[in-house]
Amino acid sequence: MAKTNISPGMQQYLDIKKDYPDAFLLFRMGDFYELFYEDAVKAAQLLEIGLTSRNKNAENPIPMAGVPHHSAQQYIDVLIELGYKVAVAEQMEDPKQAVGVVKREVVQVITPGTVVDSAKPDSANNFLVAVDFDGCRYGLAYMDVSTGEFCVTDLADFTSVRSEIQNLKAKEVLLGFDLSEEEQTILVKQMNLLLSYEETVYEDKSLIDGQLTTVELTAAGKLLQYVHKTQMRELSHLQALVHYEIKDYLQMSYATKSSLDLVENARTNKKHGSLYWLLDETKTAMGMRLLRSWIDRPLVSKEAILERQEIIQVFLNAFIERTDLSNSLKGVYDIERLSSRVSFGKANPKDLLQLGHTLAQVPYIKAILESFDSPCVDKLVNDIDSLPELEYLIRTAIDPDAPATISEGSIIRNGFDERLDHYRKVMREGTGWIADIEAKERQASGINNLKIDYNKKDGYYFHVTNSNLSLVPEHFFRKATLKNSERYGTAELAKIEGQMLEAREESSSLEYDIFMCIRAQVETYINRLQKLAKILATVDVLQSLAVVAETNHYIRPQFNDNHVITIQEGRHAVVEKVMGVQEYIPNSISFDQQTSIQLITGPNMSGKSTYMRQLALTVIMAQMGSFVAADHVDLPLFDAIFTRIGAADDLISGQSTFMVEMMEANQAIKRASDNSLILFDELGRGTATYDGMALAQAIIEYIHDRVGAKTIFATHYHELTDLSTKLTSLVNVHVATLEKDGDVTFLHKIAEGPADKSYGIHVAKIAGLPKSLLKRADEVLTRLETQSRSTEIISVPSQVESSSAVRQGQLSLFGDEEKTHEIRQALEAIDVMNMTPLQAMTTLYELKKLL
């Protein structure tokens, strides 16, 4: 960056830029925001704008790019979306009145985690996350600057931190400590996060309660410091810090939520095809955000769940009132975001009109809720604050046709302010007054062509031609002399002109001041507005769940304390919605007190994964308070759901399918309790057959003997079905098929007992593989079934199948391979029953190196 012969203006730019080295600096110059040096070069590429230079003829011209100030937001949005920060430097004085260089200051730093003014507003939350570490536990705080939501918790390990960041869908993470290289790689490379750093703790007793752990206080304080440092203003909309515990909600990792398509479809990354899509009949942006939060964090408190259920039931029983409620909610704007715009000093007349329109709807909503005549609904009604005085202020002050900007005028209603009304009257009637003066003076003077004209130099004046100069009255005074005429003024005309000019100037200034005063008054109501927003959002979500329950014929689930699962004719709610009720085949699911594991066998495409997901979605919907897709449901309360459904390599982190399988299995068996739900689909398929089968068996036994969680384990390893004779809490189920005249029909129904065939070749036939290939596969299958003998399920840790059995059962297609005595000894020494899956994986890896 060459600095020779730098002008005062460019020196000012460089002085500001050095304080914001990690941000694009938008430097206001007149009607443009300019970027210089490296910022200009990079921005020109990213924003596809022209790159020019300042001082083109100089030895070292300065690269320059710019965007118009009125459209700058769309360019800022692009940079933020790409993960960059933007510092905005404004002119702090009128350039016409400036002495020397115009004073400029950065007024805001916009980052991916602090977006408020996007040109494409999104109803979803945008959380900024802060993490600190005290050497033992992690403090994690998060905030949505656009709504003021502010929460904190503490977590035991980095895996939990990573999962919570993913669940929050954060784009920026603020760190108060040094990460390891591996942790930094995870956050930056794998999760594509912008990392920012903050060391100073901001103390605000009005927001942060002291009854927190030290690491929670530092995480929350550093987050607050960063927000104040970037936004550079008082933020009255920030809500008091809320402490939460992960254990107070149904725990699910980001991978689990993704595999279950909770908030977006994992294949399309779109809302359509997700549980969120299915349940979203909300009418407000606040309701949409809250619904997503409920799906993300189902409850574990039976009392809280039943409270939600009760209100949904009341709404279900009153169709007309619920319809009126839904229609009224359509008139409710995003109170949380509008409040934040007021707090940021960015609310325009349209924003206040939306707020006023919303408040005008509240009495109707309150009356409808009262008409339900229900004690559980009355709890919501009693907390509704209609803010009638604020609604009256906005209604009487802001013109309903006011523009979106505060510089165009016509903002304030007539009748609200006497001075403003007077100025408007002067501007409105001034032209008439001038016409009256013109007519009066023409008649009095006898100058028939006397007229009043206007220009910027002379203002209003009487135009008198030379031929009529002798008729000019004495009270006229000369303002200008032209070749063929004279320009005159009068005291009366000057007075009217002064009034009109004053009215024009003062009206604009006064209207601006009045609007600012009104906005300041609105700001004093922010806390009450935020409380109202929460209640309306809750009402919106509950009516949405009632609408969905009625539309799809859902039932109210029950809960028990005896670890029994009973689902009669259950459906996968999302699949049913996509397929249609007529095509979907329901399935019942039953776990009695003695059953902890269902081992499910059956061919691909037969419905095993759907059956497992059906159970998970039923649990999630039930524990978020929703009604569910079944004829009858009775469930225990689960504390966590762990899944491994669907196989895919983690390409970004370089982890194979098998490694991902083992890591997720490890998380499940380490963290699950006997109140958890585990769903494993084809675990072990990512490695060689016998490796996979050995691990699958070991994991099943470990869960059975040590964890006790309710588990569905889907497998292609039919040999594992023999475990039911050795594990008392395991039962076999399978997907029923109908075989007739060589054709196989998958019934998509779960039946008791193990499957007798795999039907893999039939699936290949459905997929359209060539007939010759299928015929060859049949021949190979027949040969394998003839050669191999049934595999013995290992019931004692030291009992390991001989290498000849392994060769005969797995490797006959590829030829025998002699095993060394060393490998045989190593295999015999393995204590399978006392190994974790991760240890088993490591041992297998070491054994393979001996080959």
UniProtKB/Swiss-Prot annotation:
Any one cellular-component term (Gene Ontology): cytosol
GO molecular-function term, one example from the UniProt record: mismatched DNA binding
Q: Which InterPro entries match?
A: DNA_mismatch_repair_MutS, DNA_mismatch_repair_MutS-lik_N, DNA_mismatch_repair_MutS/MSH, DNA_mismatch_repair_MutS_C, DNA_mismatch_repair_MutS_clamp, DNA_mismatch_repair_MutS_core, DNA_mismatch_repair_MutS_N, DNA_mismatch_repair_MutS_sf
CDD domains recorded for this chain? Answer: ABC_MutS1
- Domain of life, per UniProt, equals Bacteria
Positions bound to ATP: G602, P603, N604, M605, S606, G607, K608, S609
Which residue spans adopt a coiled-coil conformation according to this UniProt entry? none
Query: Which GO BP terms, alphabetically?
Result: mismatch repair
Q: Which UniProt keywords apply?
A: ATP-binding, DNA damage, DNA repair, DNA-binding, Nucleotide-binding
So what family is this one in? Belongs to the DNA mismatch repair MutS family.
Q: What does this protein do?
A: This protein is involved in the repair of mismatches in DNA. It is possible that it carries out the mismatch recognition step. This protein has a weak ATPase activity.
| Stored NCBIfam families | mutS1, PRK05399.1
What name appears for this protein in its UniProt entry? DNA mismatch repair protein MutS
